[in-house]
């Protein structure tokens, strides 16, 4: 998918990942090219790349933030390198802190600085996607278009010699985020937002495939979704990370649509619509009904609407609460029993000690050595008793 050269550590990481997952994967051309190009890096970049290749992410962060050689690197480029490092380390939460910093940092119209700033913003969008927060991903992209009206045109002209995320990958991220997070009733309105006009001019997948959903052509949509789209996503390092959950979410969105308009529907019908086996559809619908607390039951091949019964719901709740209460009471009984045993043991120990002291007082007076010896023993016993309490 990538046209140009990948950021070298990412190319290596991507190569390692796909080699471990797909036995027939061949080393990427970008990786071979970069292994030669990297020798011409500045000294600081060679050092940083070396640390990233060794997965020394914490050291890389310290190096970017504090090494003297980084003082000549612009603020947005340093920020870009920091965000890249956190993403390579899958430390997505740390990236969120950069949003407020970028929003308060002034920028100039200098091309290199603007390019680094745009990539920082795109990396933040990528980060929301990798966190699985697709609606946030869309919101950030729309806001970025509002802030930079010619954003898509600028993205197309960004340098191609150090790519961390390609334009195509970013456009697909926006597309799948919209498809899974925008309600079906609002999808047509979203696609026709004025802010997205330039996006559609350069990338028409969202408009084209979204129209299939809007027109209820689900079989045609899922034929593309489970074939061309799946194949594409599984060849992309970032899209592949979220594809399984995204694909399942898209299907559950369709199930919810049908359950909303029907009181009885066949699993085999849904299986045909989404293009996967009945077994998988049954599992996913069962999960959807359970997690969303929907009033449906599955009987063989039929999904049937079950009218809400307050009495039955109350009985189920009381039964659940009774089980929970019984478990807690049983736990308290065990704790009380254990406490009673400990108290009885301590009482017996103290009684025995008192009896020994009483017996000793009736005997002949002790000399000085016996007194000190007994005192040491008593002290040890008292200390042990304190710890046992």
Curated annotation (Swiss-Prot):
Keyword Cytoplasm found: yes
GO cellular component, one term: cytoplasm
Primary gene name: PCI8
Domain PCI: 143-312
Subcellular location: Cytoplasm; Nucleus
Domain of life where this protein originates: Eukaryota
InterPro entries xref list: PCI_dom, WH_DNA-bd_sf
Protein name: COP9 signalosome complex subunit 11
Task of the protein: Component of the COP9 signalosome (CSN) complex that acts as an regulator of the ubiquitin (Ubl) conjugation pathway by mediating the deneddylation of the cullin subunit of SCF-type E3 ubiquitin-protein ligase complexes The CSN complex is involved in the regulation of the mating pheromone response. PCI8 may also be involved in transcriptional and translational control.
Alphabetical keyword list: Cytoplasm, Nucleus, Signalosome
Quaternary state and interactors: Component of a COP9 signalosome-like (CSN) complex.
